[in-house]
Amino acid sequence: MGMKRKKISIIGAGFTGATTAFILAQKELGDIVLVDIPQLENPTKGKALDMLESSPVLGFDANIIGTSDYADTADSDVVVITAGIARKPGMSRDDLVTTNQGIMKAVTKEVVKYSPNCFIIVLTNPVDAMTYTVFKESGFPKNRVIGQSGVLDTARFRTFVAQELNLSVKDITGFVLGGHGDDMVPLVRYSYAGGIPLETLIPKERLDAIVERTRKGGGEIVNLLGNGSAYYAPAASLAEMVEAIVKDQRRVLPAIAYLEGEYGYEGIYLGVPTILGGNGIEKVIELELTEEEKAALAKSVESVKNVMKVLQ
């Protein structure tokens, strides 16, 4: 048997899906299959071809195709799900639940049929509940179904901190726990600039303001765009997770993982620090939390559970 490139399928060829495909191709992480509904097959093929035609200039080797036929995704190593309706201004993530749950179930059936051994990364909002839906529908083990929110939330937090301190974002590390939404819990105690705790560098009221802006980061962009939601940073975050799995990097990354007792919670998907590598979620890292952080996390869990009550 000859060596084969990895195969990564992206379900949903909207702004986020297409941007993810473009980043993955440039990183040469594998061949890319971009999938959308039959009515959008031609535009999807057009996007894929346009990206492919950039490869001689950007200097990457990757085959990129657009399709509406899941047979083209057969034997994918990683499948990224971005399909679903997007949030409009004034709409909460929860309004999306029922529509997107139906989409998740339909997509998951096809994914499992053609790629029974793949890893699935879910981006569709409300992401904690949608990841749970995909997990249940797929019958996959918990390590192979992962949600993306923490990498993005942490990226926003790190961006704002770097701006505040006028430092390189590369030197800023941070962690965000909990649900993806207004109840996320940025763990300032575990956040550093070049190994120096942020609390020693930024006054408390400024840090609180950064935390607040991070919580509302998605909404800030929704309001500015006026139509649609963020896609560059979400796509970059998905690509980082795909890379960790495909290259077996064993990265410490926040991800939405299925909890079985960690942090005192059972049977839900929640954003936690994980080790992400060739086996997907290889470990959930349990951090010591203060009473205040535990209370904030409990509130976050409550929000996730409230959304899950809406699930059919």
From Swiss-Prot:
Keyword NAD: yes
Annotated Gene3D superfamilies: Lactate dehydrogenase/glycoside hydrolase, family 4, C-terminal, NAD(P)-binding Rossmann-like Domain
Keywords noted in UniProt: NAD, Oxidoreductase, Phosphoprotein, Tricarboxylic acid cycle
Classification via InterPro entries: L-lactate/malate_DH (IPR001557), Lactate/malate_DH_C (IPR022383), Lactate/malate_DH_N (IPR001236), Lactate_DH/Glyco_Ohase_4_C (IPR015955), Malate_DH_type3 (IPR011275), NAD(P)-bd_dom_sf (IPR036291)
GO biological processes: lactate metabolic process; tricarboxylic acid cycle
Annotated GO MF terms: L-lactate dehydrogenase activity; L-malate dehydrogenase (NAD+) activity
CDD domains xref list: LDH-like_MDH (cd01339)
Sequence positions that bind substrate: 87, 93, 125, 156
Residues noted as binding NAD(+) in the record, renumbered to the chain: 12-17, 36, 100, 123-125
Keyword Phosphoprotein among UniProt keywords: yes
One Pfam family here: Ldh_1_N
Modified-residue entries (Phosphoserine), positions: 149
Catalytic residues (UniProt): 180 (proton acceptor)
Enzyme class: oxidoreductase
Lineage: superkingdom: Bacteria
Reaction equation(s) it catalyzes: (S)-malate + NAD(+) = oxaloacetate + NADH + H(+)
Functional summary from the UniProt entry: Catalyzes the reversible oxidation of malate to oxaloacetate.
Family assignment from sequence similarity: Belongs to the LDH/MDH superfamily. MDH type 3 family.
Name by which UniProt lists this protein: Malate dehydrogenase
Organism ancestry: Bacteria, Bacillati, Bacillota, Bacilli, Bacillales
